Curated annotation (Swiss-Prot):
Keywords of the record: Glycosidase, Hydrolase
Protein name: N-glycosidase YbiA
Pfam families given in the database record: NADAR
GO MF: hydrolase activity, acting on glycosyl bonds
The organism of origin for this protein: Shigella flexneri
Role: Catalyzes the hydrolysis of the N-glycosidic bond in the first two intermediates of riboflavin biosynthesis, which are highly reactive metabolites, yielding relatively innocuous products. Thus, can divert a surplus of harmful intermediates into relatively harmless products and pre-empt the damage these intermediates would otherwise do. Helps maintain flavin levels. May act on other substrates in vivo. Has no activity against GTP, nucleoside monophosphates or ADP-ribose. Is Required for swarming motility.
Catalytic activity: 2,5-diamino-6-hydroxy-4-(5-phosphoribosylamino)-pyrimidine + H2O = 2,5,6-triamino-4-hydroxypyrimidine + D-ribose 5-phosphate; 5-amino-6-(5-phospho-D-ribosylamino)uracil + H2O = 5,6-diaminouracil + D-ribose 5-phosphate
Family indicated by similarity: Belongs to the YbiA family.
């Protein structure tokens, strides 16, 4: 690789792309982005709707979540502990998120192109509201959503 290309590659590796709000430049990476996905025969208004609904075994409640007007309401319903969570939720939640993300980026070609164009930058869901899926606002969170997006980006690049 020529020296200049190596320098550009190095600069991109040091680049961090933050996302959180759907109005950000990379807001479509947010699970709240209005990008419907079709999974298991159902169309979900957002990946957030799908993800939150999968926390529950109660089909009626899952359908209620699917039909709510906004991802914010879906997220609130996902935190409802008067409804029992799946017993295995903690062990399957990342698989569920992977499935939602793959559906979103496979079903929306322009998002796939955008995601691939970010390589090899680090993707960070930058928010104080979540230290598991996001960075906790201070960089100390796990940023699992960012890592799953980078993992998907690698897979899509190979499949391209």
């Amino acid at each position: 690789m020529p020296v200049r290309a190596q320098r550009i590659q190095h600069v991109m590796q040091d680049t961090i792309i933050n996302f959180y709000s759907t109005s950000d430049d990379y807001g479509d990476f947010s699970n709240f982005a209005a990008r419907p996905i079709k999974v298991d025969g159902n169309t979900w208004p957002t990946s957030e709707h799908y993800f939150q609904a999968q926390k529950f075994l109660d089909e009626k409640y899952r359908e209620e979540i699917r039909r709510v007007s906004s991802p914010m309401v879906a997220a609130r319903m996902g935190r409802n502990r008067s409804k029992p969570l799946r017993k295995n939720w903690e062990s399957v939640k990342e698989q569920v998120m992977r499935k939602a993300l793959r559906a979103k980026f496979e079903q929306h070609a322009e998002l796939r192109v955008l995601l691939l164009a970010t390589a090899p930058a680090k993707l960070v869901e930058h928010t104080e509201n979540d230290a598991y899926w996001g960075d906790g606002g201070n960089g100390k969170g796990k940023n699992r959503l960012g890592y799953l997006l980078m993992e998907l980006r690698e897979q899509l690049a190979i499949e391209k």
